[in-house]
Each structure stands twice: as structure tokens, then as C-alpha cells.
Amino acid sequence: MDMPNLRARLLVVLVVLSGFLTGAGVRPATAEALPGSLWFDDTPVTVRDGRLTDGQGREVVLRGYNVSGETKLAENKGLPFASVADAKKSATALRAQGGGNAVRFLLSWSSAEPVRGQVDTAYLSAATEQMRAFLDAGVRVYPDFHQDLYSRYLFDPDSWYTGDGAPKWAVDAGNYPDESCGICLFWGQNITQNEAVKQATRDFWHNAYGLQDAFLTTAEKTMAYVEQHLSSAEFTGVVGFDPYNEPHAGVYDSGQTSRAWERDVLWPFYEKFRARMDAAGWQDKPAFVEPNLFWNANISFQKQEGGLLDAGTLGPDYVFNTHFYDQKAISGIFMPGKAGDGQYAGDFGTVRDRAAATGTAGIVSEFGHPLAGTVSDKAPTVLKAMYQALDSRLAGSSWWSKPASSGSVLSGTQWQWDIYNGRHHEPMNGNPDKVLTSGDAWNDEDLSAVRLDDSSTPVLRQDARLLDRLYPSATAGTTVGFTYEDRSRDGSTTLTWNPVPSSLPNVSRLVGSGQYGLLLWRSDGTSAPTELHLPASFPTATTTVVSDLGTSYGPPAYTRTTPIAAAPEPGGTGSRRLLLSAPDTGVLHYALVTNGTTAPSTTLLTAARSELSAWAAQRAG
């Protein structure tokens, strides 16, 4: 595809559209720096040399959650929250309790364009204000026009299933058969078994009734509105846009393969969406593009060839964006028992490889596992294994012996963060006699990591040691390897998949039974520090750092001349970070961070540092 010329032609056509909102409101005055911001903060994230980087040139890792499945429901009119106050409360908890620095923010086409050709600016205003709540908390945002099973309006009031996405007028435009999934055990089977879903989806991709054109126009107007109604500083925190959730052909044309569909149908759509982003003022932000939904399915009969194999080099305009769910574990049939060490190293390694092959960064924008029901007992191990695979492409059992093979640290947003979990009031498909209240109130799902307690305070539904993690949010140079042993629990059992080897006795003694993370990186002259999120379980006063830069128990406050320091994360939520300053070039650095031994002696710290220095030189030098 000749993308530059295509974009140039489309920009000429779209320039008039891009100005439709210029009189709809004045951009807010530039906001002051967020509480806790330091001189190197508040810069945009872009793609450079196949990595997400900030304005200082540091490698950036985005970690957080999808906000939220509530957007799929009608009860809050396609918004993640009932109010801005709830959004603010949720954002603070996500940052301080959930350890997140980013959210995939769900939007609804149905709510944005309830009448064909008429964008609902009241909806866009409410959505933008809720986004602002996260940006003000120091959480980066990438919006997503979400859909599942194409539209709720395909489904009968008494149906077992529902969808979300396209507006009613888009469904009314087609003469679709009465929906039926036949013999279905899981809602996702509607994608390939429900003729109404299949035909409507195919019509979208083939632009029947001008559906795709209408969607693209609404997407552009939405992006223009957001750009114009956030301050420049706030808009800096918007990372990019996810054009379409979990794309699938619906129905393949005669003789068409899944790979050909990606090449001939899906990719041209992404090029059109990219041009709309440019016209709306998002030209410096990447599109987070997803391959065919089934490209990386881990059940063989579900898998379809894909992964944007024919898209060529994506470069800075795109991020390779995918989902991963362990369908074997979710099935309750194909995976007896629980997940173990290195369970998903291969699956997430494939994501790294495809992102590298396309010349861009990768992200797993959805992953998770049911927290209720017959397979919920697998959740602690499945999620631990998924986070382990985001951190490194190695199993814990082999990490210490070959850390330089660890690979990049992947960005990821867990599904999901819905504070209304278990408190919904959703008339399913508009049926007043079928009001859903439990779980996520959508197709029997229950995956939210958070809920509100009796005092309406957000509380975690999963082990905080699993969710609030140590991770390198910004690396000044190139990551060589990273691992984090979270010691999360499966019931009463503490899961330890990456123990410190006996060949490092002083490091092992220092860590003890505590949590620890270890980052290796090679500096590139960047003056801004390397930054790791400090979980709440790592109080500054009792956190130990052993590094080639020095040792510290209770790191001091940050200054430009302090090599190992701690500081608040921007946003004023109480979350914190470790800052490691090494403004040299081409030097291998390491930092072990642990909450193990209390008040370790200088002798122990020195001995542990000596062991780690020798190990790093041998294994990664």
C-alpha cells in the first residue's frame, strides 16, 4: 500500500470535516504540571526505533487496565462511569492500589452517533471529562472504540446473549436474520456461529450502506473533540487510539483466507483510520492496531493465520496491539489443573516477535481470566503467568542463567477495572424483566479486578501482590532483562516461580521471603533517570536497592545528583517510584529492588552487590 499518498489524498478530503468542531468550544488553558511532576515528566509517548519512548528518549512501559466493560452497558449510557466523581475515585485507586500508569478507555459508537450523521457532543463531553480524571491522576490514556458481536441491537430482548458497538440505525440498515447461536457454551461462539452477527460484521467491513464511512467520520469527529477540549498538557497524556476491538471478517468472501482478509480488508481500514487521526490533530500519536482476533488463539481449531503478516514495516504511526486469553483454561476442558512457571512465555514471545518484525512496539491491550465460576480457581496462577510473560520471555526457572534473553518488557492493560462490579442495574437488551446486577452484567462475565465496598470505596478483588507490581515504567537506555517475583498467592499458598539461585547466597539472604525485582539495562547517555513503579508493598523507608550505582536502604528523595532515589509519581495519588540516575553511555547497569530483609547490614549489602556485579558481568556483560 502507498500509505503516504493515500493519507495525502484523504487529508485533502477530510480537512473540512476536521474543522466541524472549531466553534464548539475553546481549548482549556494549559494546565499546571501535575502534583509530583519532576523536570523530566509530562512528555508525550511516541514510537521510535520499535519502542514506546517518552520525550526524554526513555523506553516506556504502559501497565494498567481497561476502563471499562461498563461502556458496553446501557445503564450509564455508554460511559465507563456514572459521574466524573466516580471516574476520579476510580483513577486514584487504579494508580495507588492497582499500580497502573495507563488505561485503555472504552468508547461506544452507539452512544457517540445515536442518530446517523449526528454526533452526540453531550456524550463526547462526558467521556472527555472522565478521561480527564485519569489524566489528572497521572494515568496515560488510549481510547478504544469498542465492539463485541457487532451490536446489542442485533439481539432479541429474551436472548441469552448481547453485544455492543454499532448503533441501532446501523443494524436497521441491514436485513439481518433473527439472531441465534445454536449450541453455544460461550458467548464468543456467536462470532462464528450467529448468522446475524456474521452478516452484520461483514457488511461493516465491506462498507455496505456506508457503514464504515459513517464510523470513520464519527471517529474523526470524536478525536477532534477530545483534542480540542483537553489542554495541550492533558492531550500529551493521550498515547494513541485503538480503532476497532477484536476484528474478524464475520464472513469471508469465496476463496478468501484469514491472511488475505487482513491484507485486503483490515489493513486498508487501518490506513483510512490513520488518515482520520491525522486530520483530527492526532498526527503524532500512533494507532493501536489489532490483527484478526483469532491469530494467536491457543486452541488449534480456533486459530486463524494472521498477525498483520503482509502489512510491512508499520513504523511510528502504529503499535502492534493484540489480546490474549487462555481459552484452554477458560474452557474448563482443554487445560486440566492450573498454570505454571513459564506457561505463556511462548505466546507472549510471539507478540514480541511480531511487533519486532513490523518495526514497532507491541502491547497486549487485553488479558485476564474469570474471577467467578467453574474455572475461577485457575485465576491466581493464570494471571501470575501472564504478568510473568509480560515482564520477560523466560520462565523463572531459567531467568537467572540467561537474563540477556529476557527480551523487551511488554506493555499491557488487564481486562478489566469496573468499580460497579456486582452492583449493576442493566436491563439486558432493554428487557425490564431481565435486569442484570451480578459480576460484569455482560454475557455472564466476571473479570473486574476491583469493586466498591459497602462504603463505596474501591477495593481490589485480586491479590494486591499480583496487581500492584514493580515494573520499569521508563528506562534510560535499552532494557537488557527484567524479572519480578511477586510472591502472589493461590489461596493460602505463596507462589514463588523465580527464587534467587543458591549460587548467590547473600542475594538470597537479602531477599529472603520478600518480593524482589531485578532490572538490567544499558545506558545511552539519557540524562533523565530510569524509573520503576514502587508497589504499596514496598514502603520507601523499608525498600532495599542493590545496584552497580550503589546500595540504599530507604532511598532518599530525588535530586539530580542522587543516583538512587525515591519520589512520588505524578498525579498526587500517593503512588511512588524509584529513580536510578546513570547518565553515561553504553554501560551495563543493574538494580535489585526488594522488600525482604529489614535494615540489612552494610556487610550484607556489600556482599550482595559483589555477587550481583560478578553475575551481571558473566551473564549479561
Region spans (language model):
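Aromatic-rich peripheral "rim/lid" segments of glycoside hydrolase catalytic domains that contact
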Residues: 308-315, 321, 374-544, 567-620
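Low-complexity, acidic Ser/Thr/Pro-rich repeat tracts that form intrinsically disordered stalk/linker regions
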Residues: 28-35, 617-621
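Short polybasic amphipathic segments
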Residues: 50-54, 543-546
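Short conserved micro-motifs at the rims of enzyme active sites and ligand-binding pockets
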Residues: 4, 330-334, 424-426
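Secretory targeting and sorting signals
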Residues: 1-32
